[in-house]
Swiss-Prot record:
The keyword Cytoplasm applies. This is Putative caspase recruitment domain-containing protein 17P. GO terms for biological process: cellular response to lipopolysaccharide; negative regulation of interleukin-1 beta production; proteolysis; regulation of apoptotic process. The lineage of its organism: Eukaryota, Metazoa, Chordata, Craniata, Vertebrata. Coiled coil: none annotated. It comes from Homo sapiens (Human). InterPro entries: CARD (IPR001315), DEATH-like_dom_sf (IPR011029), Pept_C14 (IPR002398). The gene is CARD17P. GO terms for cellular component: cytoplasm; protein-containing complex. Residues 1-91 form the CARD domain. Pfam families: CARD. Gene3D superfamilies: Death Domain, Fas. Interacts with pro-CASP1. The keyword Ligase does not apply. Its main location: cytoplasm.
Amino acid sequence: MADKVLKEKRKQFIRSVGEGTINGLLGELLETRVLSQEEIEIVKCENATVMDKARALLDSVIRKGAPACQICITYICEEDSHLAGTLGLSAGPTSGNHLTTQDSQIVLPS
């Protein structure tokens, strides 16, 4: 599942993600109602460094479960191809329900 993939990529995500991608992800997660405005503000205001924000963001998404993680992965693949490549992520080409990592392919239920 997507949550397992994000857990496996957590350290690398925290080290690699930029502030622009974090802000874009926060916007996407608010728009898709994965995170509330309050949760967004906590990530932005209570974490001083980009790495702290990345850690708080990813941990919040992982706690929300596999569908939330898939939204996060899809956003990364569509909006930050360099980060997606660094993490070995790619979203499925058609339905968005396929997640391919360097190690395995996971098919998420529709």
